[in-house]
Swiss-Prot record:
Organism: Acanthamoeba polyphaga mimivirus
Presence of the UniProt keyword Cytoplasm in the record: no
Gene Ontology biological-process annotations: regulation of viral transcription
Family: Belongs to the nucleo-cytoplasmic large DNA viruses (NCLDVs) VLTF-3 family.
Renumbered residue ranges of the record's region Disordered: 1-35, 58-77
Function: Putative transcription factor.
InterPro entries: Poxvirus_VLTF3 (IPR007031)
Protein name per UniProt: Putative transcription factor R430
Positions with biased composition (Basic and acidic residues): 26-35
Compositionally biased intervals (Low complexity): 7-25
Keywords: Transcription, Transcription regulation
Recorded superkingdom: Viruses
One Pfam match: Pox_VLTF3
Amino acid sequence: MEKFFITDNTTDNTTDNTTDNTTDNTTDKLTDNNSIDNDKINKNITVDSLTNDLNKLSLKSPSDKSSSGKSSIPNKSLVPNKSLVPSKIFFSKTTFFKIKLDEIMSCHNITISDLNSIKNKIESKNLQIDEINTIIIGKILKKLGLYKYHGHEQYILNIIIGKPVQKMSSQEKNLIMKLFDQVLVTFNLLKKKYNWNNFLHYGYLIYQLCKLLEYNDFLDNIALPNNETIIYVNNQAWKKICSHNNWIYYEISQIKN
């Protein structure tokens, strides 16, 4: 059987606060992730500097269009005034999104002992590397009582199979945060028209923003909701948000394992 090796990008510190906001219940509403610590609010995030930051990162300008006429990045002229969003909602959702982004994109601190326990459980099942997926990792975490890593199955899988874990730069994170501001304002503008009760799933949204910005190296680290209906509902909302902002729409057609 193929041997498993632990990569060097782990530390001895545990992350106790990693959580997952997904649900296995079928629903026709968008998932709700409103819990937030207001003391962590960063009120310095703005949308206004978006164009300058894009230029600094040498990304495509808002005028660059695909053959379909859709822009690969936000067009500043289409950004609604963020004063349309109640300030409490704007800053709480922005802060919670930042926390989730940091959880997903940072190199999560998994102890060597926990990783060895996961590896030993895999070996006891006589599984080959190509047989391991996030569902199996999730079941192993549950059996071992490692609930603090729930929602980070993809990250752990990448370590187990020896796949390099990409780290996101502060510039890339800041740009995603600014795009999130625009998404939040657009969502608030459209929610009455389409009867949206809750915000998009954060893992889904992070995945789509990375896809929009062509940050493809990070996609394998992002856990999507483990529910086809939730993905479908989020796809429908995201398609309308992209259409409103004249962005390219990428549909997620299936759950990643």
